[in-house]
Amino acid sequence: MDTSPVTPHRLDPSGGCPHADNARLLARAALAPVVLPGDVEGMAVLGHDALREFLAHPEVAKNARHFTALREGRVTAGWPLLTFATVHGMTTADGEDHRRLRSLVSRAFTARRVEELRPRVEELTASLLEDLERAAEADGGVADLRRHFALPLPMGVICELLGVDPEYRERLRRLSSQVVATDIAPQDAVAANRDLVAVLAGIAAARAERPGEDLTSALIAARDEAGDRLSQEELIGTLVLMIIAGHETTLNLITNAVRALCGHRDQLDLVLGAGASWADVVEETLRWDAPVSYFPFRYPVRDLTLAGTVIPRGTPVLAGYSAAGRDPAAHGPDADRFDVTRPAREGAVRHLSLGHGVHYCLGAPLARMEAGVALERLFTRFPRLDLAVPEGELVRESSFVGNSVRTLPVCLGD
């Protein structure tokens, strides 16, 4: 391991190529000092074992009152990562507040409830495959799979769960993508956050007047029945989190899985020949090309030593999911290889790409189910589907939080 003085890694706001950076940083240590936008100093946990320990550590908090630079006024209002730190919801809450907020939505994402959603997901998938084929026919045989398939499926599902009418969905998609962008101008970041909150507040007001069998109506009822269960800020913050997390993760998961299978035809043939399952594809994609690269934020409540590195109290720390997924110390010397048989191997290490501990991704069962259905139906119908441009020409998503590409042009095959 390289023991020369460590220069903080300046994260590329435009996304860059995380796997190359991760490999270089992991060769040095399991943790890396980083420079966030606005020259805010932070830390990233990259190694699998270190990340697993950190995510479950009792002296690590999510509430931004522990964020030293923010508390001291060194973070501006237009900071592109501010929503991740300050949104009022379960991802920025600790202890009893976290349990209270999580309990209000957890019943919508149980394994039983997710299975009840499967027929609707299959119905939406079938309809979107028709749209994808029409889009390809209208454009010389090429269609953007991300736009016509990978995006509208999870966005449609989460909006139906929340009771969001179709006319709002495109605006919510656009605002969500701006909120998670890390290369956005300060004034645009402020405007995107303001507009997203305003749109969701309007949706909540409409559901308050006309309640339905949806999660937003249930949250409003919880707010109105007992004011101490959910504040108005927490209601809107929860909707912000549900909209963003409810589609961005699955969007990137489906996109990255299609890229992986097109780039590894032997693995696709293995799955189509029943040598591995679509669930295996989902798990290997989550490990090999995690939909979230660096997730903000956690803060040590005291100086914390992790894997031999001291993280000062109040440091904003990123969870390096994409790095941990390819950590050879956990996943072996072939960690960089996409292998759909890996998840079923005896002794295979489970990835951390959907989190660990009390903040484990609430929507994980839904994301897995949506991706599994989408991939199976897509490649069953279009087994010769392939990228329309070389992988190296795909433009990266403009974020070091999300990990994917902006568009995914594909040919559907004969």
Segments (PLM) and residue ranges:
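Cytochrome P450
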Residues: M1-D414
